[in-house]
């Protein structure tokens, strides 16, 4: 199982939010410095979120993200504010390995098929942000149907992987809820990366044993509640 530290960027700075709220941001400083630190500690890749894009400022941080993507030369997946095929293509052409499309994939599901046909499914990840079994879109404000049904649909449209975020536990550093993860893994064949609430090597091990392909570490990693080497050891045990 792969481990992807989150590098969430708001107004040019690395931040962590609680429950997706910008007013609850904790600022950690230079995103590039954090990216290099996590890679030096052995991360399998980076999970980059352009929060300004998610909040409607699509191109903000673009130069910064492009620069450290080129510098690090590591696997990078990116989400946040991807509202069109053109947005996604711009990031993929800039060197991002995989784009994450969430709200727009629900609004315009055929976008997944178009991107998969043009760039290959392995570079297209559908984001599934769920609360109480419902996909949440538009900043986690509006429910849009069963997360399991959407997962199956995205898979059928050609998404090469899924990012599952449990909104109920995201940013709280209180541990994962494994049941919805196992239900999702039983319904799809594509790799599933899990985000939200991962706060200990035990959480990582539970996801590994369930069959998740990867885990995104965010708030607990930056707060020092979990150390990256310990998470990596749990992720790669038995390999």
Curated annotation (Swiss-Prot):
Q: In which pathway does it act?
A: Amino-acid biosynthesis; L-histidine biosynthesis; L-histidine from 5-phospho-alpha-D-ribose 1-diphosphate: step 4/9
Concerning HAMAP family, the annotation shows: HisA (MF_01014)
Matching entries from NCBIfam families are given as: 1-(5-phosphoribosyl)-5-[(5-phosphoribosylamino)methylideneamino]imidazole-4-carboxamide isomerase, PRK13585.1
Where does this protein reside within or beyond the cell?
A: Cytoplasm
Q: Please give the PANTHER family that the UniProt record associates with this protein.
A: 1-(5-PHOSPHORIBOSYL)-5-[(5-PHOSPHORIBOSYLAMINO)METHYLIDENEAMINO] IMIDAZOLE-4-CARBOXAMIDE ISOMERASE (PTHR43090:SF7)
UniProt record, GO biological process: L-histidine biosynthetic process; L-tryptophan biosynthetic process
Originating species: Methanoculleus marisnigri (strain ATCC 35101 / DSM 1498 / JR1)
User: Catalytic activity, per the record?
Assistant: 1-(5-phospho-beta-D-ribosyl)-5-[(5-phospho-beta-D-ribosylamino)methylideneamino]imidazole-4-carboxamide = 5-[(5-phospho-1-deoxy-D-ribulos-1-ylimino)methylamino]-1-(5-phospho-beta-D-ribosyl)imidazole-4-carboxamide
The active site is formed by 8 (proton acceptor), 129 (proton donor)
Its recorded name reads 1-(5-phosphoribosyl)-5-[(5-phosphoribosylamino)methylideneamino] imidazole-4-carboxamide isomerase
Cystine bridges: none
Q: What is its EC number?
A: 5.3.1.16
Q: Which domain of life is it from?
A: Archaea
Look at the named UniProt entry and state the broad enzyme category this protein falls under. Answer: isomerase
> Which family, according to the similarity comment?
Belongs to the HisA/HisF family.
Q: Would the keyword Cytoplasm be found if you checked this record's keyword annotation? A: yes
Alphabetical keyword list: Amino-acid biosynthesis, Cytoplasm, Histidine biosynthesis, Isomerase
Please give the Gene Ontology molecular function terms for this protein: 1-(5-phosphoribosyl)-5-[(5-phosphoribosylamino)methylideneamino]imidazole-4-carboxamide isomerase activity
Give the encoding gene's name.
hisA
- Mind telling me which GO cellular component terms the entry cites? cytoplasm
> What CDD domains does its record include?
HisA
Q: Name one Pfam family in it.
A: His_biosynth
Q: InterPro entries from the xrefs? A: Aldolase_TIM, His_biosynth, HisA_bact_arch, Isoase_HisA-like, Isoase_HisA-like_bact, RibuloseP-bd_barrel
């Amino acid at each position: 199982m792969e481990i992807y530290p989150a590098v969430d960027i708001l107004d040019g700075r690395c931040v962590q939010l609680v429950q997706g709220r910008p007013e609850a941001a904790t600022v950690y400083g230079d995103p590039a410095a954090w990216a290099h630190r996590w890679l030096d500690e052995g991360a399998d890749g980076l999970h980059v979120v352009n929060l300004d894009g998610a909040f409607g400022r699509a191109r903000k941080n673009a130069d910064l993200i492009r620069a450290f993507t080129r510098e690090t030369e590591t696997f990078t997946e990116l989400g946040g504010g991807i509202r069109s095929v053109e947005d996604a293509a711009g990031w993929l052409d800039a060197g991002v390995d995989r784009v994450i499309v969430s709200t727009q994939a629900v609004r315009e599901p055929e976008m997944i098929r178009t991107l998969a046909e043009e760039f290959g499914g392995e570079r297209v990840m559908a984001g599934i942000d769920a609360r109480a079994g419902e996909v949440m879109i538009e900043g986690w404000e509006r429910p849009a149907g069963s997360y399991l049904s959407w997962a199956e649909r995205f898979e059928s449209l050609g998404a090469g992987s899924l990012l599952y975020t449990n909104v109920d536990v995201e940013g709280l550093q209180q541990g994962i809820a494994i049941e919805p993860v196992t239900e999702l893994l039983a319904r799809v064949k594509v790799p599933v990366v899990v985000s939200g609430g991962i706060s200990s090597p035990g959480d990582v091990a539970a996801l590994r044993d369930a069959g998740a392909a990867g885990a995104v570490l965010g708030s607990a990693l930056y707060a020092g509640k979990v150390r990256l080497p310990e998470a990596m050891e749990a992720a790669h045990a038995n390999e």
